[in-house]
Regions:
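Flexible, compositionally biased loop and terminal segments
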Residues: 1-231
Length: 231
C-alpha cells in the first residue's frame, strides 16, 4: 500500500526552452504544479507523506542570475503557504530538510515560521528538500552522532540502521515510491539513506507538463508491483 511518495521535479529549464518561455515563467509553472500534485494526491487517503526535491546543494552552483530568480520565486511562494486553503483543509504539516545555513536569514525565518505554523496539523506531511544532498545528510548525521558519543550519550556498539536514521534531518516515512520527471533516470543524491528499498518511476515529461492522469498511472503501477525488500 502506497503511503509515502517522493518527487524529483526535473526539467523546468528544458521546458522553458521547448516552449519558448522564460526560465522565470517555467519555474513559476513548476511551483504551481507542486500544488496541483498535492491536490491530485489528496484523493488517495493512504498517501500521507509527500516529499519534493526542490533544490539540491549542487543546484546552488548554477549561474547567480538564475539562482536569484529561483530563490525569489521560492520566497514569494513561502510567503503564501500559510494562507493557502489546501494546507488548512488537508491538515498539512510541512518540514524542510537540507543545509539551511546556505540561505539568507530571511529565507531561514520563512521556513521556520511555516514549520511552526503547520506543526498544529497532522493529517498529511509534506517534506521539502531544499539545499539538500543525501550524502551530505549522512555525513551530518554521523557528525551529530559522534558528538553525542564524545559526550557519553550513546554507545556505538548499539548503533543500528534505524538508530542512525534518528540523526537525519527530519523524521518521516521513507518513500515507497520515487517519481522523477524529464526522462532522466537517476536519483541525483535524493534521500540516499531513506531510498534503499524505494520503488522508482520515471516519466518522459518535464515537471510542468505532468498531469493528474500521469499521477494516477504511477500510483496504479506501484500498486501492481510486489515489493520484496531484498528478501
Amino acid at each position: 500500500m502506497l503511503q509515502s511518495i517522493a518527487f524529483i521535479p526535473d526539467g523546468n529549464r528544458r521546458h522553458a526552452s521547448s516552449e519558448g518561455i522564460s526560465f522565470t515563467q517555467s519555474y513559476v509553472e513548476g511551483t504551481r504544479k507542486a500544488w496541483d500534485v498535492l491536490n491530485w494526491i489528496s484523493k488517495y487517503p493512504n498517501i500521507d507523506t509527500v516529499i519534493f526535491y526542490t533544490l539540491s546543494l549542487k543546484n546552488l552552483e548554477r549561474p547567480k542570475t538564475e539562482l536569484m530568480i529561483l530563490l525569489k520565486i521560492f520566497e514569494q511562494e513561502l510567503d503564501k503557504v500559510m494562507k493557502r486553503n489546501e494546507v488548512i483543509e488537508n491538515g498539512i504539516n510541512i518540514k524542510f530538510i537540507g543545509r539551511r545555513d546556505v540561505f539568507s536569514k530571511g529565507f531561514q525565518t520563512r521556513m521556520e515560521k511555516i514549520e511552526k505554523y503547520t506543526d498544529q496539523f497532522r493529517n498529511k506531511q509534506v517534506i521539502i528538500a531544499i539545499g539538500y544532498d543525501g550524502q551530505t545528510e549522512i555525513v551530518d548525521a554521523v557528525k551529530h552522532y559522534t558528538a553525542e558519543f564524545a559526550q557519553g550519550k550513546v554507545n556505538p556498539g548499539e548503533l543500528t540502521v534505524n538508530e542512525l536514521q534518528k540523526y537525519l534531518y527530519a523524521d518521516f516515512k521513507s518513500p515507497d515510491l520515487i517519481v522523477r520527471t524529464s526522462k532522466e533516470q537517476r536519483l541525483s543524491g535524493f534521500l540516499t539513506y531513506q531510498s534503499a528499498y524505494s520503488e522508482l518511476a520515471f516519466l518522459d515529461k518535464y515537471w510542468p507538463e505532468i498531469t493528474e492522469e500521469d499521477i494516477d498511472a504511477v500510483v496504479a503501477d506501484y500498486e501492481n508491483r510486489h515489493r520484496r525488500f531484498g528478501k
